[in-house]
Amino acid sequence: MKNVKKGKRKKSDKPQFGLISKILLTINILVVVLYLTACYIGYVDPDSASYLALMPMAYPLFLIATIPTLLFWVVKHRRLMLITVCSWLATIPQICAFMPIHFNDIEQAQSEKGSYTLTTYNTYGFAGDKETKNAIIDEILEKNADFVCIQEATTIDDLRYWHTDPDRIARLCARYPYVHFSNKNHTLGCFSKRPIGIIMEQSIGNYFYVEAYKTSGLGGEIYIINTHMESIGLTVDDKRLYMDLTQTAKKETLKGVRSHLLNKLLRADRQRAVQARLIKSIADSLRTASPHTPLFICGDFNDPPYTYSYLTAKGNYSDAYTDAGVGYAHTYNRNRFYFRIDNIFYDDRLVEAEACRVGTSKASDHHSVTATFNNHNK
């Protein structure tokens, strides 16, 4: 009888898919689903999306959360990298809005013949001491834009009343001989180097204002919409709660605080949705009436990129910072709400964004945003 030798079982060349890998795969899939939801829920009306509509506010966190499992798969199971990589490929527009990479020189762009520069700046009513007011004026003068859209504005007379540096006021008035402030609480205003025509003014409640201006630039007439949309809806006390929440909070109070803040945020988000539709209708009517006139939409939108109100107000227009900015940027700088909520949208059929930068001055609770444009056929 022949002896039959049992062959040794060959070890698989593939790495074992153990318990840790299974747990991480589950976490990876869950994080990617949340990440994709944060990227695309902005296309759904907040009335239908409910609390999910707030997810784009946490987009950076979801993006960062996709990285650890990707690094693990690089070492252990490279094929599973595709889960995260495919989610990134599916969200290239969102990534570019969050972290654009355009190495350009805004000063050089401004010096080009025929260029036109816009600044949008929420000045917080020039609140603060004399030095703060002076610093806000310095920020405006430093940017040297052709047209400056102001939110939470104040009049030149008020600046004089508050004993702001008269030399700075004189330089501001000399640089911008054409000045306008809205009739209601002076919430909106603009400074221009060229004559201004007021097309329309509208407000709803105490926090939403929109104006449309007509001026000249880029070789002809241009339209500029200036807006201040509903704030995030949190009071000073609410913001303190949020700061406590981002540090340490007792377990028994955490749930109640979170629910309180989310309800307020959702209510404000739904109000901005209505306001964004109004802004879109104004832009659409101007575009229909004068399709070959460049139009810009500037202001404090109080919502980060790829939220419903951002996408609705932007419509078919382009975001200057996405197209001509560089790196991560936030335009609100207080209470740990580090979001890019101030924007300049433009009609890329007629003009192109040469460069866009977010200011660094903290004199106001917002940073300024400045963009330089030129005609396609420059």
Regions found by a protein language model. Name each.
Residues M1-G18:
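N-terminal Lys/Arg-rich, disordered targeting/topogenic segments
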Residues K5, I20-Y35, Y40-L52, P56-V74, ...:
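Metal-dependent phosphoester-hydrolase catalytic domains
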Residues K239-L265:
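A solvent-exposed, charged loop/short amphipathic helix patch at secondary-structure junctions
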Residues L63-E107:
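Transmembrane alpha-helices and immediately adjacent membrane-cytoplasm interface residues
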Residues L118-T119, C149, I297:
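Residue-level marker for buried hydrophobic side chains located in beta-strands
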